[in-house]
UniProtKB/Swiss-Prot annotation:
It comes from Bombyx mori (Silk moth). Residues 56-103 are annotated as: Central domain. GO terms for cellular component: egg chorion. Residues 104-119 are annotated as: Right arm. GO terms for molecular function: structural constituent of egg chorion. Residues 1-21 form the signal peptide. Pfam families: Chorion_1. Residues 22-55 are annotated as: Left arm. This is Chorion class CA protein ERA.1. Transmembrane segments: none annotated. Keywords: Repeat, Signal. Belongs to the chorion protein family. InterPro entries: Chorion. GO terms for biological process: chorion-containing eggshell formation.
Amino acid sequence: MSTFAVLLLCVQACLIQNVYSQCLGRVGPGGPPLGPYGGPLGGPGYGPVGYGGCGGYGGSGIGNVAVAGELPVAGSTGVMGQVPVIGAVEFAGPACAVGSVSISGACGPTCGCGGSPYY
């Protein structure tokens, strides 16, 4: 195998170990004389204080973000070219906008000739 392939294999092994390993932050030295100053592997790492161990990385959910309050946004945005929107665009609640919108060209999913949609 080439040197680059071996290096790539080692990097992948480190990444896999990082993903599937246990968080052992603040694990101190072991042994009977140093027992109160460090915890066993996987235990609380703050000695006799008794803080909980680290949890694994992971998350689940839909990914919605709720924003409450006023968000003063100022500025202008210029969009040139084609902006395809596939799917649904939805606003819930009052969405006040000040300014102007100009739409020109072929609107809707057409082939560009103003005919019937291509789907």
